[in-house]
């Protein structure tokens, strides 16, 4: 099966990357995440190779002063496979940048099964357990990118009527964009992080071309 990947680069004057915020979703780190690799045809021989390459890419793109927003499903979680989600969350220790995790359905599954349904207990684990390195864990969030407000939430629903949404959840199957926002899933950007400039480029294309094309073809 062939794939179409978007491969965005953010290069400042002199070739130096200066972006401070990055976005991704649906990484599904974890010791038993091989089914995700197979289902999405991710081009890695096993979960160890996949994880190693993702860590390399993230640390190459984002500096220790930058912030990566992971918009859900950082980890994989299946009932009765507790080590799966814990090993997935532990990948955060290998990342140099700050990480803000937005809860996805896999994190919610871990909350329901292993943390008595308590978001706060899960958040405390992510922030304080020695195996993890997260700066914050949130149900959703807002960010301002060059004067434009964006709502960050895992599932692709038109939650915020006053701004665009950055989401994940559908992997590559839902496409790159919806009328209400953009899919920043890892499968949509050749396994690289989306930058602020990438988001603004897509917003410009959406306003200039994509919305009009949708109106013509609807």
PLM feature segments, named:
Residues 1-18:
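Short, Lys/Arg-enriched N-terminal segments with co-localized hydrophobic residues
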Residues 11-13, 63, 216:
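Intrinsic disorder/low-complexity segments
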Residues 18, 217-218:
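Non-catalytic terminal accessory segments
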Residues 18-20, 24, 147, 179:
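Sequence-level motif detector for i,i+2 pairs with an aromatic at +2
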Residues 19, 64-66, 97-98, 148, ...:
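Short coil/turn segments at beta-strand junctions that form active-site/ligand-binding loops
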Residues 22, 69, 100, 166, ...:
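Hydrophobic/aromatic beta-strand patches that form the interior of the parallel beta-sheet core
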Residues 24, 29-139:
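Core catalytic region of metal-dependent phosphoesterases/phosphodiesterases
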Residues 117-217:
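Conserved beta-sheet core of the metallophosphoesterase superfamily
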């Amino acid at each position: 099966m062939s794939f179409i990947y978007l491969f965005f680069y953010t290069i400042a004057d002199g070739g130096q990357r200066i972006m401070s915020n990055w976005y991704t979703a649906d990484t599904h780190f974890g010791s038993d995440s091989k089914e995700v690799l197979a289902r999405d045809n991710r081009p890695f021989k096993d979960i160890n190779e996949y994880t190693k390459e993702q860590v390399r890419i993230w640390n190459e793109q984002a500096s220790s002063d930058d912030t990566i927003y992971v918009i859900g499903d950082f980890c994989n979680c299946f009932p009765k496979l507790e080590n799966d989600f814990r090993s997935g969350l532990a990948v955060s220790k290998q990342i140099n940048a700050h990480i803000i995790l937005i809860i996805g359905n896999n994190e919610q599954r871990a909350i329901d099964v292993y943390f008595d349904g308590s978001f706060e207990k899960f958040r405390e684990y992510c922030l304080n357990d020695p195996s993890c390195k997260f700066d914050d864990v949130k149900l959703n969030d807002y960010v301002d990118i060059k004067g434009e407000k964006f709502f960050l939430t895992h599932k692709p629903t038109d939650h915020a009527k006053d701004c665009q949404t950055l989401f994940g959840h559908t992997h590559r199957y839902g496409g790159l964009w919806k009328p209400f926002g953009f899919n920043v899933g890892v499968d949509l950007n050749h396994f690289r992080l989306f930058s602020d400039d990438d988001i603004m480029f897509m917003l410009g294309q959406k306003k200039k071309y994509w919305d009009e094309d949708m109106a013509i073809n609807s």
